């Protein structure tokens, strides 16, 4: 097997996306690079698979949709929490009727990282937190909303013959992060 090509640096992905022998770019970088890498890949004729969150705001979301439609390239958002053992087992039980007819479901993903603020990924010696914890400290709310929503949507067959009509999100006083 040939040795894997390595691309590095802030814009290293641009060279990767220009290759003719690649059909799909799988994006599992820090969150702030998901969008620019996806756009570059589709602009260069590649299909895209992006870990969540795929974008950081609604403007970027529509830009991905528009680029996918313009280039006719797939842009698939990946939600790895749909495929862990517990979630797959629960989905199987729901599909087998173990719970009866599922008519209401509730999901959440709570990942308090404050105990790790001094022991997590760093971007260099001067970096106190690293990109992941920096984001958690500066923002409130569920930064991985699809982790809780994805498995529930699968169990309810959302977009497989059913769809969400009301969607409710709640917020309480901040325990960690921005007040």
Sequence positions of predicted segments:
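Beta-strand-loop-alpha-helix segment that lines the small-molecule cofactor/substrate pocket
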Residues: 24, 30-31, 35-83, 97
């Amino acid at each position: 097997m040939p040795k894997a090509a390595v691309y590095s640096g802030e814009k290293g992905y641009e060279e990767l996306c220009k290759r003719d022998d690649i059909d799909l770019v799988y994006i599992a970088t820090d969150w702030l690079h998901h969008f620019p890498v996806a756009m570059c890949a589709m602009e260069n004729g590649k299909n895209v698979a992006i870990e969540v969150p795929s974008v950081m705001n609604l403007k970027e979301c529509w830009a991905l949709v528009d680029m996918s439609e313009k280039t006719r390239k797939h842009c698939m958002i990946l939600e790895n929490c749909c495929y862990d053992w517990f979630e797959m087992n629960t989905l199987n039980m729901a599909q087998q009727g173990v719970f009866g007819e599922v008519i209401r479901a509730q999901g959440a993903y709570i990942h308090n990282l404050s105990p790790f603020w001094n022991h997590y990924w760093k971007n260099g010696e001067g970096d106190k937190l690293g990109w992941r914890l920096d984001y958690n400290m500066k923002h409130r709310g569920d930064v991985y909303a699809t982790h809780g929503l994805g498995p529930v949507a699968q169990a309810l067959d959302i977009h497989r013959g059913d769809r969400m009509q009301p969607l409710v999100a709640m917020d309480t006083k901040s325990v960690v992060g921005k007040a």
